């Protein structure tokens, strides 16, 4: 009778299983050892999770596929930074290829900072074109945050190296002469918008980290310009910086004091 492989050896040998129908799982199921049964459950859980992630990713390509089938380029557009008291609103436009294959690309808010940082260069490498559009604090104060976001999105679209035939936008209408699909929570429904949300978020986070070095004491690297206790204390102690939005209430109160 042949000796059973050790559990450590089994774990190593079965690490490459990528399909629930793999015949090796049947052999593992027949192994009565408690550790083998635990390993079976772990593998089944991993594969089920991966399959669910793949199905969700394919669902996020639903809006792009009809246009790709006609050979049209689709740009996803999203923004980050509408709510902070400091820093610009940053938008991104991303044109993905029809063979785009990074299943983890999802709404940036559902990803950790580490995951976003890992996905950022992968998106840049696979995308056909990527552009950033910025609405400065001065522009926000001049025309309000909603209109500044629209202008920033317009800049992102016009900055693309390739002309898109279709836009998928997260809940806004952009002033450009290109057909648009407006999606509520588009960053969770469209891979193109999700990619744009990640690019915009990582870009803005890096920018705010730079501002943190220029204007220490507000916690910009940690709070990204949002009105945290540290940020509000910095405003009270140090006053308003050139990157603060002067029409936003807490900043306005400091200026009027």
Curated annotation (Swiss-Prot):
- Which sites bind a divalent metal cation? 78-79, 170
Q: Which transformation does this protein catalyse, written as a reaction?
A: Endonucleolytic cleavage to 5'-phosphomonoester
Q: Which CDD domains match?
A: RNase_HII_bacteria_HII_like
Which Cys-Cys disulfides exist here? Answer: none
* InterPro entries, per the entry: RNase_HII, RNase_HII/HIII, RNase_HII/HIII_dom, RNaseH-like_sf, RNaseH_sf
List keywords of the entry alphabetically: Cytoplasm, Endonuclease, Hydrolase, Manganese, Metal-binding, Nuclease
Q: Name one Pfam family in it.
A: RNase_HII
| UniProt entry tagged with the keyword Heme | no
Q: Which GO terms describe its cellular component?
A: cytoplasm; ribonuclease H2 complex
Free-text remark on how the cofactor is bound: Manganese or magnesium. Binds 1 divalent metal ion per monomer in the absence of substrate. May bind a second metal ion after substrate binding.
Which EC number(s) does the record attach to this protein? Answer: 3.1.26.4
Primary place of residence?
cytoplasm
Q: Which GO terms describe its biological process?
A: DNA replication, removal of RNA primer; mismatch repair
Q: Which domain of life is it from?
A: Bacteria
Name any one GO molecular function.
Answer: manganese ion binding
Annotated compartments: Cytoplasm
- Give residue ranges for domain RNase H type-2: 72-257
Name the enzyme group at the top EC level.
hydrolase
Q: Which cofactor does it need?
A: Mn(2+); Mg(2+)
Specify the protein name. Answer: Ribonuclease HII
């Amino acid at each position: 009778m042949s000796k059973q492989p050790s559990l450590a050896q089994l774990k190593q040998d079965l690490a490459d299983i990528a399909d629930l129908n793999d015949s090796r799982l049947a052999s593992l199921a027949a192994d009565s050892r408690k550790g083998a049964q635990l390993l079976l459950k772990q593998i089944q859980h991993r594969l089920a999770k991966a399959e669910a992630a793949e199905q969700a990713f394919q669902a996020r390509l639903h809006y792009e596929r009809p246009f790709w089938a006609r050979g049209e380029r689709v740009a996803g557009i999203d923004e980050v930074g509408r709510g902070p008291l400091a820093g610009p609103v940053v938008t991104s436009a991303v044109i993905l290829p029809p063979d785009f294959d990074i299943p983890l690309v999802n709404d940036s808010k559902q990803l950790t900072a580490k995951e976003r940082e890992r996905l950022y260069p992968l998106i840049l490498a696979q995308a056909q074109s990527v552009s950033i559009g910025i609405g400065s604090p001065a522009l926000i104060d001049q025309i309000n945050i909603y209109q500044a976001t629209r202008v920033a999105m317009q800049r992102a679209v016009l900055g693309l190296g390739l002309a898109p035939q279709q836009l998928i936008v997260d809940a806004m209408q952009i002033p450009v002469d290109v057909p648009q699909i407006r999606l509520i929570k588009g960053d969770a429904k469209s891979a193109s918008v999700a990619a744009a949300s990640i690019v915009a978020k990582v870009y803005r986070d890096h920018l705010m980290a730079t501002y943190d070095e220029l204007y220490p004491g507000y916690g910009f690297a940690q709070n990204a310009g949002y009105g945290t206790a540290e940020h509000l204390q910095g405003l009270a102690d140090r006053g308003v910086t050139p990157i603060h939005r002067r029409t936003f209430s807490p900043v306005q109160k400091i200026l009027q004091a």
